[in-house]
């Protein structure tokens, strides 16, 4: 059987997984809790997530901590300047380039986001990266096709 895929969740995807008890992002967290996928985020994502929850839903901070513990979250290290510059050349936005570079350096199999403007609608990202990029639903379809159907 193939190794479990490593998934990077950006802030939008992680927020959706914590905010809603259903939906694709929450399904990814459930897969991680079951140990069939690995989830990582960057320090920037954790910081943004905490700030967003403090502003929009402070009562969910405890839920975030419990979920992150249950899924065995791994923290991607800050990528070196050369990787950051390569990501910046692809995406053009410094904050998003940092997140992209950190996931790239970690060696993820899939980058999950709900950010259409900066990630999903940039075609050059889909061909310029060594990993897939898509929505939670896109990832779940890819996972089913590449891990479930191939092993049944």
Residue ranges and their predicted role:
Residues 1-5, 150-152:
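Intrinsically disordered, low-complexity and often Lys/Arg-enriched segments
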Residues 8-9, 19-55:
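PIN/NYN-family metal-dependent endoribonuclease catalytic core
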Residues 38, 72-74, 130-132:
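Conserved beta-strand segments of alpha/beta enzyme cores
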Residues 43, 47-85, 99:
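Domain-scale selection of a single, long terminal region
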Residues 46, 109-110, 116-152:
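Acidic, PIN/NYN-like endoribonuclease modules and their adjacent C-terminal/linker elements
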Residues 74-116, 120, 124:
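Active-site neighborhoods of divalent-metal-dependent phosphate/nucleic-acid chemistry enzymes
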């Amino acid at each position: 059987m193939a190794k479990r895929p490593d998934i990077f969740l950006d802030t939008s995807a992680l927020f959706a997984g914590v905010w809603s008890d259903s939906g694709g992002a929450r399904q990814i967290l459930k897969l991680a809790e079951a140990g069939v996928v690995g989830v990582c985020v960057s320090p920037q994502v954790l910081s943004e997530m905490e700030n967003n929850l403090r502003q929009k839903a402070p009562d969910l901070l405890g839920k975030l901590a419990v979920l992150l513990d249950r899924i065995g979250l791994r923290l991607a290290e800050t990528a070196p300047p050369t990787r950051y510059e390569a990501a910046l050349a692809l995406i053009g936005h410094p904050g998003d380039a940092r997140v992209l570079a950190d996931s790239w350096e970690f060696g993820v199999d899939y980058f999950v986001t709900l950010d259409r403007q900066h990630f999903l609608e940039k075609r050059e990202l889909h061909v310029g990266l060594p990993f897939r990029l898509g929505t939670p639903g896109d990832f779940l379809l890819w996972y089913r096709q590449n891990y479930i159907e191939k092993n049944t």
